[in-house]
Regions:
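Extracellular/mature segments of secreted proteins
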Residues: 24-29, 52-54, 68-74, 78-81, ...
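Sequence contexts marking disulfide-bonded cysteines in secreted/extracellular proteins
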Residues: 17-19, 44-46, 62-64, 73-75, ...
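Export/targeting segments at the very N-terminus of extracytoplasmic proteins
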Residues: 1-46
């Protein structure tokens, strides 16, 4: 057998992350192998993850700590990414259409909404919405 065909025990045992979400990914018809890794990179498989994007040279120190609704109103916050696949708050109209509520709410923290919006984006743009990661 050629050396290149040999798979080490470590490689053979490598599992796709975010196993607890695989059924939901399948239900939303998202490719499990790709989106499990994206989900791990973006949120570490945590449905309630929020990532803040700040303006220019500003960062979290320019904002008071506290609840989501207070932090999102901080002058330093440009946008935020929410949920398992870190959907950006700029997708407000789309989120309202698919999930019935604004990105200014916590709707994208619900896995069913987050994955439904991700499915729409994936069907139209492929993996491009997740290609860049500034964090």
């Amino acid at each position: 057998m050629p050396v290149s065909a040999v798979v080490s025990p470590v490689q053979a045992h490598k599992t796709v992350p975010c196993h607890k979400w695989h059924a939901e990914l399948k239900r939303h018809k998202l490719p499990v192998d790709e989106f499990s890794w994206i989900m791990y990179r973006e949120s570490k498989c945590v449905a309630k993850a929020v990532g803040w994007n700040y303006r220019g040279d500003l960062d979290h120190t320019a904002c008071p700590s506290g609840a989501f609704h207070r932090h999102r109103q901080c002058h330093a916050v440009k946008s935020w990414d929410m949920g398992l696949l870190q959907i950006n708050s700029g997708h407000n109209t789309l989120t309202k259409h698919i999930c019935g509520a604004s990105t200014r709410s916590r709707i994208l923290l619900q896995p069913s909404c987050n994955l439904a919006v991700a499915k729409y984006l994936y069907d139209r743009y492929g993996l491009a919405p997740w290609a860049g990661n500034s964090n």
